[in-house]
C-alpha cells in the first residue's frame, strides 16, 4: 500500500491536488474533515477561529499527531493500494504516518507564495477561511507552531503551485501517475 500525503501552507493547493487525485480514481482522506467533524460535534460555528481552536485543543489533549491517529483506521479500511491524504499539518503527523504505514508513506509538499494563496482564499469562500492577508499570516503562524515547517522540510517531493491551474494539474497528474504505475492493479 502507498499513501501519498499533501502538506503545505493554507490555500497552497492541497485540496485541489486531492481533487485531482479523486478524479484519477484514487481514494482521498481529508484530515481537515476530522477537525470540521469535531467542530460540528461540539455544536460550534465552522469558522477559522473555531476550527483553529478545536485543532489546537485536539493536539494539546491528544498529542500533536491526534488528527493523523484519527485517520489511520480510515486509511486501513479504504481497501486500496494507493490512497491520498489531504492536509498534513505537522511533523508529528508525518512521524505517525511513517511509523504506522511504513515505507509506503510518501509526503508531497505544495508551495505557493502568500499573495497567491490569499487571492485563492478570497475566491474559494469556505466558512473557515480568513478575510484578510493578516488573518492568513496569523493562520500560517498557528500552523507553523504545529510543526508545519518541519513537515514541509520532511517531504519527498515538492510541487510548485504559483502559475495556472492547468500547469498545476499537469504537475500533480504527472507525480501521481508515477505512483499509480508502481502500484499493483486490483
Curated annotation (Swiss-Prot):
Keyword Methyltransferase: no
UniProt-annotated binding residues for ATP: 8-15
Keywords: ATP-binding, Nucleotide-binding
Keyword Metal-binding: no
Gene Ontology molecular-function annotations: ATP binding
Gene3D superfamilies in alphabetical order: P-loop containing nucleotide triphosphate hydrolases
Family to which the UniProt record says this protein belongs: Belongs to the UPF0200 family.
HAMAP family on file: UPF0200
Protein name: UPF0200 protein Mbar_A0975
Lineage: Archaea, Methanobacteriati, Methanobacteriota, Stenosarchaea group, Methanomicrobia
